[in-house]
Design a protein with these regions (language model features):
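Short, Gly/Pro- and small/polar-rich lid/capping loops
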Residues: 1-47
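Short, hydrophobic/aliphatic alpha-helical segments
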Residues: 43-58
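Conserved phosphate/anionic-ligand binding catalytic regions in large, soluble enzymes, centered on
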Residues: 58-72
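Residues forming anionic-ligand binding surfaces in small-molecule and nucleic-acid pockets
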Residues: 71-75, 82-101
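Hydrophobic alpha-helical hairpins/lids featuring a short glycine-rich hinge
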Residues: 103-111
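Conserved small/polar residues in nucleotide/adenosyl-binding loops
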Residues: 117-124
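Hydrophobic alpha-helical segments, chiefly the membrane-spanning helices
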Residues: 128-134
């Protein structure tokens, strides 16, 4: 599966004090989006600049919503590396939750690769290529 990557033209200012980020207050410059189509599964994966979402008032999410939340926090170690605690396991937990909610599973390895791609590197430089998974 290929992924379309569009990086932001105006990155957010980096926090002055990375040791005091808090939770749910700072967000990345990008977001990972993928749709589900019956008979095809998860399709159209892409990374886009962070933006607001627009929803039709008739969207079924407002009337028959199912949701899964799997929080994951990344932080910078003293040596400059970005650390995430068991992020691949986080993708697996998402699938266990999806099964319980009768929702379609994600491809763990593909989504893990997207997670690594959207996470900042020690000097905010992205890899030159996005991993591709069949």
């Amino acid at each position: 599966m290929e992924i379309d990557v569009k990086l932001t033209a105006s990155p957010k200012a980096k926090p002055q004090d990375e040791s005091n980020l808090g939770f749910g207050k700072r967000f990345t410059d990008h977001m990972f989006i993928m749709e589900y189509e019956g008979g095809k599964g998860w399709v159209n994966p892409r990374i886009e600049p962070y933006h607001r979402l627009s929803l039709d008032p008739a969207s079924s999410v407002f009337h028959y919503a199912q949701e899964i939340f799997e929080g994951l926090k990344a932080y910078r170690a003293d040596d400059g590396r970005i650390l995430m605690f068991r992020s691949r396991d986080n993708c697996r937990r998402l699938n266990r939750s999806a099964e319980r909610m009768c929702m379609p599973p994600i491809d763990v390895e593909f989504n893990y690769g997207c997670l690594l791609y959207t996470s900042p590197s020690p000097r905010d430089k992205r890899q030159s290529r996005m991993p591709s998974y069949a």
